[in-house]
Amino acid sequence: MTFAATVLTLYPEMFPGPLGVSLAGRALREGAWAMDAVQIRDFAIDKHKTVDDTPAGGGAGMVLRVDVLAKAIDHAREAHPGCPVIAMTPRGKPLTQERVRQLADGPGVIVLCGRFEGFDERIFAGREVEEVSVGDIVLSGGECAALMLLDACIRLLPGVMGAASSGHEESFENGLLEYPHYTRPAEWEGRTIPEVLRSGDHAKIAAWRKSQSEIDTRLRRPDLWERHIGARVQSASGAQREVQDD
């Protein structure tokens, strides 16, 4: 099955952009995924191709019109039924690896890119649009965020990455940051590769990597660490209840 990536944007020339090279580009050429960049302006309702208007209540900037957005979304949904519609916006829920994996396991995704002051609020409930943020930052538009979302999905598609285990050992896949990596030379400016990684003892290497993941997560992302600990406690409690029920 080909993963269908549809982007609704005022700048379709930005796609596939960096997704046309490297692993994603090869996967695109091989048909693992397909790219359709749709010009929102094509769905304008006047001869001037107007897609925005002034904010109700006053204020700076312009807001993308709900009627234009709705027509663009309806067009994309008709072409790709079953694909969720995601709007890239700093007001959205933080994008997680778990959500990325859910999307990658599906038929595709329709990504709505904003510009100006953003979207008319009514589009989200009116067309069941999921709001997603890639970080606590504000970009000039949603296109760069859309590229991030699509790249995260594409690399998880079957056959895109070389090693089957690659996607499962990375940061966030098990709720932790990924362990540190090293390669030759063994010594550089007095800094050496940890001895355990040169030992050939796979059990010790696995234990070291797990320990480093936990240490780095605890120090660098205490929010992830607290979530990880909470999940472990919940899992242990559930297992204990099952034993007691038996």
Swiss-Prot record:
Keyword tRNA processing part of the UniProt annotation: yes
Chief location bin: cytoplasm
Keyword presence, ATP-binding: no
Cited Pfam families: tRNA_m1G_MT
Positions that bind S-adenosyl-L-methionine: 114
Biological-process GO terms, alphabetical: tRNA N1-guanine methylation
Origin superkingdom: Bacteria
Cellular-component GO terms for this entry: cytosol
GO molecular function, one term: tRNA (guanine(37)-N1)-methyltransferase activity
Record EC number: 2.1.1.228
Reactions performed catalytically: guanosine(37) in tRNA + S-adenosyl-L-methionine = N(1)-methylguanosine(37) in tRNA + S-adenosyl-L-homocysteine + H(+)
Membrane spanning stretches: none
Enzyme class: transferase
Keywords: Cytoplasm, Methyltransferase, S-adenosyl-L-methionine, Transferase, tRNA processing
Cellular compartment(s): Cytoplasm
The family this protein is said to belong to: Belongs to the RNA methyltransferase TrmD family.
Subunit field text: Homodimer.
Function: Specifically methylates guanosine-37 in various tRNAs.
Protein name (record): tRNA (guanine-N(1)-)-methyltransferase
Gene that specifies this protein: trmD
